[in-house]
Amino acid sequence: MSETLLSSRNLAFELYEVLDAEGLTQRERFAEHNRETFDAAIGTARSIAEKFFAPHNRKGDENEPRYENGQAILIPEVKPAVDAFLEAGFLNAARSFDAGGMQLPTLLSQACFAHFQSANAASTSYPFLTMGAANLIESFGTEEQKQRFLQPMIDGRFFGTMALTEPHAGSSLSDIRTRAEPASDGTYRLKGNKIFISGGDHPLSENIVHMVLAKLPDAPAGVKGISLFIVPKFLVNDDGSLGKRNDVLLAGLFHKMGWRGTTSTALNFGDNGECVGYLVGKPHHGLSYMFQMMNEARIGVGMGAVMLGYAGYLYSLEYARERPQGRVPDSKDPNTAPVAIIQHADVKRMLLTQKAYVEGSFDLGLYAARLFDDTTTLATEAERKQAHELLDLLTPIVKSWPSEFCLKANELAIQILGGHGYTREYPVEQYYRDNRLNPIHEGTHGIQSLDLLGRKLAQNGGAGLKQLIRLIADTAERAQAYESLNALREPLEKLVARLQTVTLGLLTDLAQGKVNSSLANSALYLKVFGHTVIGWRWLEQAIRAEEGLTKGNAADVSFYKGKLQAARYFLTWEVPGCHHELAILEALDDVCLNMQDEWF
């Protein structure tokens, strides 16, 4: 039977040949695990995803949540799927044994989650949002807040959301208008409107805990005046039982292009002046707290984009193998049988492009998860700091590159299916629609590019960038052991050298106050930087593939040769094109910056 969620062989390659998941078991936190426990968790995830999540993916798309009597109504299949996820323990996959968790490395929890993201992005989002909200309370909440709200979330009784966006303030959070007035009992009364709140209402849990950004009456202007509040759908009594309904109203549902099975809500807080909220942490520190959840979410968005691209790639690959159509160009006999379309060179190009984008992104997402483990479990503080600096630098790439290029992979999957791909009878058009959200939410491409070029590169004296350059150089040096990899290594080394020169120039211009011109083409910089990182990850995979071929396992020869061909494609077809964009960046080209609105 063909695999539809992801390639189990490729996952094993990443975990055990590229990223050394077993090496993590040498660390104290993961010492009770081994490859058997890792594989058991992955097997359970695959089984639940196939049995409970994948079967209603299309139905959830065709039957959006409905707004009835102030509530959101979902199709009945969502609840059993989410319950199966909870019962298997995946909500607390990374949490410690003492807290009732599986104490898995983040690398392994992300490997497990990938199956759910591929099977059904919409239904998966409900527990995923809850994990992020719970982590936020765990990091910054009081002991009372943890007992009242966090523990029921860990138990799967309460779910969570992230409530940031307002009708007039999307990316520009400094302009939010939701207000929080202090009450005599130490709580706050919130008033305002939030939109596009995923999971803002549903019947899947006893309660919903909204993490809400708002401003206090004495708040400073801008982002330094934003505070964070816990606002439950139902108030919680001191004994843990549910109290009365809080003054949070579901005002309506948005009807989306994709991701239709997830409620996208408009929420009104405090229409009756009785919306109770609880301040999290210090006043005016809300955005810095929320960024923890947002950074986690951005990595999750990147992996979600990967898995939708992966699902489309696998489906179009199977289709191309089974669909007979036409004959190869040198076939002169019209009586010969049509060949499977995978025999046509242009179809191979589209499949190879998908493979390069999807498997390159998959490697990067899991590498980021491995880095997250390093930030918490490496032996020394200096090592943990290094890992954090690198992860911080790579986060905009982990979020944005798969969101752009795995969406392109979905487009190619549709093209391979031809007319069938354009119909709703085949799943690839839904994968595209679902994936189109990922370049938008949790920080658009433009926001990510400004974050990378305007902030992350120079952070801590450029420590993250210097570390990345050293890692790429190390990979290139190890690649020299294989003559066949010279043609792959050299384009990457040329790109890295050119990127360093252009980056230094841009950072110098920024330091000299040329802010607008230096950042005007930041989206191009994001793309080139991303191609550099993905090129590095493909060269690393190519080295591991060569090592695998050297071991001589006949059953894996085709797998490893496929890896080498995809690496060759990306490093010799995609990477060289970045030099044109670097020239535009170096020149501080102003064609976009100086375009006037009346000229359009």
Where are these regions (language model features)?
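A glycine-rich, basic-preceded beta-loop-alpha segment at the flavin cofactor/substrate interface
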Residues: 196, 235-251, 256, 266-297, ...
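Internal maturation/activation junctions in enzymes
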Residues: 126-130, 141-183, 193, 369-388, ...
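Amphipathic, small/basic residue-rich leader segments at the start of a protein or domain
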Residues: 1-124, 148, 373, 583-584, ...
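A structural-propensity feature for long, helix-poor, extended segments
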Residues: 133, 142-145, 149, 444, ...
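C-terminal amphipathic alpha-helical interaction region
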Residues: 99, 459, 475-600
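C-terminal helix-coil-helix/basic helical segment that borders enzyme active sites and/or dimer interfaces
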Residues: 359-398, 504-520, 541-558
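A short core secondary-structure module
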Residues: 187, 191-245
